[in-house]
């Protein structure tokens, strides 16, 4: 009963170092799971949150394919033409570097069009968010902002990027971050 507003089909997120054969097998498995997830979501037993939610849940499909453009193309086609979800997430391995991640996102996002919201999985660095919104990404999720907050850091605008609010200089500071 977490009351999530946006939920995702079940998938496998492959690590960046797996080969194309494994990535393709994983993508096909994720597509089968997506179909099962959608069928369950649309079933008469559909989960209806009672609290913690702004309303009806929305299901997102997930584009897989790792760094391989032909696999991404196939997964884009699956998500746009074989299943019908509220939105589409870009998932799976986005590469082993920021450059590869930007290449994968900039290849994938424009092909998804603007009919559905586009979500990017696992990216939470503020610089990446600003850059990737310009590429057509609507929403993001990542554990890093929450993890930083648990350890006393707050993300802030500007070159510094974050501030450790546990530092002694802030112990009596009641001003806005």
Name the predicted role of every residue range.
Residues 28-31, 44, 48, 54, ...:
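Glycine-rich phosphate/ribose-binding loops and adjacent secondary-structure elements
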Residues 1-53, 168-169, 177:
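Non-catalytic, usually N-terminal nucleic-acid engagement modules in DNA/RNA processing proteins
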């Amino acid at each position: 009963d977490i009351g999530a507003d946006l939920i995702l089909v079940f998938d496998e997120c492959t690590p960046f170092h797996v080969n194309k054969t494994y990535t393709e097998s994983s993508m096909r498995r994720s597509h089968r799971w997506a179909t099962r997830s959608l069928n369950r979501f649309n079933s008469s037993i559909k989960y209806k949150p009672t609290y913690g939610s702004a309303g009806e849940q929305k299901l997102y499909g997930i584009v897989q394919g790792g760094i391989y453009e032909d696999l991404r193309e196939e997964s884009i086609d699956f998500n746009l033409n074989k299943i019908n979800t509220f939105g589409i997430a870009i998932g799976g391995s986005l590469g082993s570097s920021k450059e590869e991640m930007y290449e994968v996102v900039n290849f994938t996002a424009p092909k998804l069009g603007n009919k559905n919201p586009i979500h990017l999985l696992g990216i939470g660095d503020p610089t990446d968010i600003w850059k990737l919104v310009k590429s057509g990404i609507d929403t993001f999720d990542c554990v890093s902002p929450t993890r930083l907050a648990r350890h006393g850091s707050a993300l802030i605008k500007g070159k510094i990027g974050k501030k450790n609010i546990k530092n002694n200089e802030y112990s009596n500071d009641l001003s806005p971050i």
